[in-house]
């Protein structure tokens, strides 16, 4: 038996599971002797400003699926687990057609080397705080368009009052790519190497689109 949740709901509208909730889930799973699985496919590998998003809650899951960020754009995924859980994963119980691809492994290694460079995650934290601050300024200026700015690190959601599809299309027309999520939310997922001037350009475009409604 297990409880499985996304540490940050991606498709669900960029909703961060509160740290207290993750800690309570850990207590429940430990008490009931069931596994806690935290899905970090979208929010892991530095996206939140920490290597794993669950680190913000100071909890330790039993199993962690990861993908996307670990490959830096190349198809790569993994399932991480504690030594205790891994004892049950004997050969044949878990496999992958493309698992162990030498090119993917090399790329994953290069990604980790970059992520763990001194100051890299701190820069993600700093640039994300700046981005969030600027987005909230836009929200304050256009309260009839933007309902909420939410997320963690460089995994940011803008929940809109206006039509999501039109907003995304107008951003695209101005050369800013975003993606939809649930509850009329658009996702802003810049690369972890994004620079301040690129954030400023994105903010300028979002303001321009807000002014067009």
Regions found by a protein language model. Name each.
Residues 1-213:
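Conserved N-terminal phosphate-binding loop of PLP-dependent enzymes in the Aspartate aminotransferase
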